[in-house]
Amino acid sequence: MRTTAYLLPLAVLFATALPGCYYDNEEELYPNSFCDTVNVTYSGSISKIIESKCATPGCHVAGGTGTGNFTVFSELKEQVDNGRLLPSVRREAEAVPMPPDGALRACEVRQLELWVAAGALDN
């Protein structure tokens, strides 16, 4: 009985103290939560989106099935100028949803919108 009297408070102490040693690191929980909408440029933001989500093997590359070779800026700009790029990435009802394997993140769509609104420059 004496052993239980000593072990029970000790067990309660450890049970309450150990969870206090755990902490959440916001950067680890939400690694890509920052969305830069101030410094949106083709070379800094847009080209990365295009390369990873559009100009992929078989899609918007030379010989791909997509309309235009987006590894060539002028062909990407043509899709911007004819008004097809934004409705597709926004997945609007009348447009062909792009990319076909899943929507862009909201941040990526916003960056594309800002870049187009600023004239879709090759900067």
List each model region and its residues.
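Aromatic- and Gly/Pro-enriched helix-to-coil junctions and flexible linker segments
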Residues: 21-123
